[in-house]
């Protein structure tokens, strides 16, 4: 009887071992298939007619993805978690489009660009400026634009703003929370030992406002950054020095004179070329590259599908 039991157990163990090997082989084949599929992946073929290449960053511009590496198209289509777009992917698309005879022009869509840092946006702008040396034009449209989005949009040869739109140009600032009063009410004693004047780290614990010394060092840090931003905009829009500052400081009075028309105030200060709707923008580009019979929009290819 024991012999029979051992035979059954031996059979079961061999069966389990065989299934394990089969699963391992299947996984290996799947892995090989994935590698083969990735290596055989080809760039989306460009249509024979001329078209516009659309630069449409989603989420933050980054130098390296924070999670598992995805293609630019996967990043653009993903709705899970914060979105990111690799700067190098967009730069590569722009550089390739410069030499591509099928690409007639560039279109910038900054509507989904999140706060990324001026340095990364400037990298993208530099690639766009280089693209323009080919003689090809760059177009952009905005319903509304944040300060960072506008820095990207301003590099366009032709920038259209929606008649109901506005630009968020307010400068840059640095804020600090102070909770000395709250700590006092909670009966928390704070003891700080410091040497010198410009020691701002403990100030939130011992003050209710910003010290003169802390304000001085923050201003010294922010002024060059803001000056660099203004110079970039004024160069891109071919405006005189101080034009951005003049726009911001004159906004209250300017809007009063225009009965609150933000878009007209932006146009009056030459921060955009023209006002128009999305339909107006598409109609203009249809004249440039023709109409796609399926979408009834202009012939276009997104950078996510281009590279």
Which ranges hold each PLM region?
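Short, hydrophobic alpha-helical packing/hinge segments within bilobed ligand-binding/sensory domains
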Residues: 149, 262-263
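Small-residue-centered hinge/linker elements
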Residues: 2-254, 286-307
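Short acidic-hydrophobic, aromatic-tinged amphipathic segments that line or gate anion-handling sites
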Residues: 160-161, 272-278
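Extended, domain-scale alpha-helical bundle/helix-rich regions
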Residues: 256-262
